[in-house]
Design a protein with these regions (language model features):
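A short beta-to-alpha transition loop/helix N-cap that caps and shapes the active-site region
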Residues: 61-65, 144-155
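Conserved hydrolase catalytic core segment
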Residues: 111-151
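Short, hydrophobic/aromatic-rich segments at coil-to-beta transitions
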Residues: 1-2
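Conserved acidic catalytic loop of the alpha/beta-hydrolase fold
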Residues: 82-85, 91-113
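Structured loop/turn residues at beta-strand edges in well-structured enzyme cores
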Residues: 19, 48, 99, 108-111, ...
C-alpha cells in the first residue's frame, strides 16, 4: 500500500493505470475511505485511457488521523451552526485538505489532474480549483450539497433527529 509522507502528514493513496496517461484524482466525501470508490467506476475510467488516483483524506481510511487537533463540537452540530451562519471552530479547513492534494500531486510529479469529488470531496475539489486552478484540468462534482439553504436545513434537521 503506497503512502505519501507529506509536510502535513501521512496519506494513503493508490494509482491505477499507465503513468503516461492523463490523471484523474478521485476525492471521497466526509470520513469516507478511498476504498469506497466502486471498482466498476475505476474500471470505466481506466477503459477511457485515464490514470486513476484515489486518496484517503485526513482522518479517513488509512491516512493519518489528526486526533491531536481537538474540537469541542460534533460534526452534526458543526454542520447545523454553519447552515445557520454561526461561527464554527474547526481543527482544519477545506483549504488545508486541498493543499494536502497539491502536495500529493507534487509527490506524484503531476502538474495537473482531472478532479472528481463526491459530496465533501467535491467541496475539496472546488477549493483546490479556486486556490490552484493551474493544477485542475477539469472538475466533476458528484452528490453535491443541496441547492437551497432551506432544503439543506431540512436535511440537516432530519440527520440530527435520526
Amino acid at each position: 500500500m503506497p503512502f505519501a509522507h507529506l509536510k502535513t502528514g501521512r496519506f494513503h493513496y493508490e494509482v491505477f493505470g499507465d503513468k503516461q496517461l492523463p490523471a484523474v484524482l478521485l476525492i471521497m466525501g466526509l470520513g469516507m475511505p478511498a476504498a469506497g470508490w466502486p471498482r466498476s467506476f475505476i474500471s470505466m475510467l481506466l477503459e477511457k485511457s485515464l490514470r486513476v488516483i484515489t486518496v484517503d483524506n485526513r482522518d479517513a481510511g488509512l491516512s493519518e488521523h489528526f486526533s491531536h487537533l481537538k474540537t469541542s463540537i460534533s460534526v452534526p452540530a458543526a454542520i447545523g451552526r454553519t447552515l445557520l451562519r454561526l461561527p464554527v471552530q474547526a481543527p482544519y479547513l477545506l483549504e488545508d485538505m486541498a493543499l494536502d492534494l497539491v502536495q500529493l500531486l507534487d509527490e506524484l510529479k503531476l502538474q495537473r489532474a482531472h478532479v472528481v469529488g463526491a459530496s465533501m470531496g467535491g467541496m475539496i475539489g472546488q477549493t483546490l480549483a479556486s486556490i490552484r486552478p493551474s493544477r485542475v484540468a477539469s472538475l466533476t462534482l458528484l452528490c453535491r450539497p443541496q441547492a437551497t439553504r432551506e432544503r439543506a436545513l431540512e436535511n440537516c434537521a432530519q440527520f440530527i433527529q435520526s
